[in-house]
Design a protein with these regions (language model features):
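Short S/T/G/P-rich N-terminal loop/turn motif that feeds into the first structured element of a domain
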Residues: 1-70, 74-90
Length: 90
């Protein structure tokens, strides 16, 4: 199992969350088995997203999807702030 943590800034959390929630079916189809969203206690527009996948290949493939990049842009993600980190279950 691989878990991806993505720290990033968004222009407006509420607008971002609507787009994120509307992408749930694509997440499942892309291999996401579990997800969670966290907000910074000091900056409500800084979010940490956790997605779990069955394999590293699924995780990398999901993050390369053009529709994911498009959804991120539509949601107001500051793509320059993206910090994906991949972790394997120990």
């Amino acid at each position: 199992m691989t878990t991806v943590f993505m720290l990033h800034r968004v222009a407006d959390y509420d607008a971002w969350r609507r787009v994120y929630d509307s992408f749930a079916d694509a997440q499942r189809q892309g291999g996401v088995t579990s997800q969670a969203v966290y907000r910074s206690e000091t900056d409500s527009n800084t979010v940490l997203v956790m997605h779990a996948f069955g394999s590293s290949e699924e995780a990398h493939s999901f993050l390369e999807r053009p529709d994911l990049r498009e959804a991120m842009q539509d949601a107001g993600v500051d793509v320059g702030s993206l910090r994906p980190e991949f972790y394997a279950e120990a």
